[in-house]
Amino acid sequence: MTQTPSIGRIVHYTLSEQDAAQINKRRSDARNLNAAGVTLASQGLGPQIHIGNKVEAGDVFPAIIVRVWESAKSCNLQVLLDGNDTFWACSIPEGDGLHNWSWPPRA
């Protein structure tokens, strides 16, 4: 049986080197600001502070399909990270390896 991607389906996403670097940078920036005593509340700002465990290329996380690009055979995903943040992965093809999504195995 072939599965068809659709909005709301949960898939697995494998982080690339660039994804991991981007996620780790925003989490590091948040730690550095906090260590310097800068808080968003003290600055009157509303952005999210990104807190979570370090990620690496090849790490696999659950993701929700938020857009299907049928013409390109790819999807936009909200990747659920091990922290308080998510990662928006755009135009990701189905497949194996880094920077791809795949169907989770049946348990």
Which functions belong to the PLM regions below?
Residues 15-18, 72:
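Generic hydrophobic alpha-helical segments
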Residues 53-61, 66-107:
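Intrinsically disordered, low-complexity, charged/polar segments
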Residues 10-14:
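Hydrophobic beta-strand signal
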Residues 9, 26-27, 31, 67, ...:
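Arginine residue identity/basic-tract feature
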Residues 1-2, 16:
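A structural micro-motif recognizing beta-strand termini
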Residues 18-31, 35-52:
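Short, Lys/Arg- and Gly-enriched loop/turn segments at beta-strand edges
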Residues 4-6:
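Short, well-ordered loop/turn sites that connect or cap secondary structure elements
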